[in-house]
């Protein structure tokens, strides 16, 4: 835990309007920490995942992908992160990969 950069609660409206299906971050939580409100813990998650159906990946090591994109100047790729097929689960380890 602890403080971390991340998305503000206000980004939810933008993500929804742009029909973003999934996001990944290199931090332990996709939303900014500490919480923007003391009313609830991780309010961004409470809306993004169960209400919007947004798929969220956290603690991704994006260094290699970032370096490869910077080297060739191409920032488009197919990204896949298949999860374990666990009925009723809300989270799973993944095996992510990017194909440039």
Feature locations, PLM:
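Active-/binding-site microenvironments in catalytic and ligand-binding cores
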Residues: 1-100
């Amino acid at each position: 835990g602890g403080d971390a950069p991340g998305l503000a609660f206000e980004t939810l409206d933008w993500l929804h309007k742009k029909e973003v299906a999934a996001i990944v971050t290199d931090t332990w939580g996709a939303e900014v920490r500490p919480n923007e409100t003391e009313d609830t813990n991780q309010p961004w998650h409470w809306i993004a995942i169960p209400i919007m159906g947004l798929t969220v990946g956290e603690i991704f090591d994006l260094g290699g992908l970032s370096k490869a994109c910077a080297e060739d100047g191409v920032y488009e790729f197919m990204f896949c992160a298949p999860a374990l097929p666990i009925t009723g689960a809300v989270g799973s380890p993944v095996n992510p990969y990017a194909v440039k």
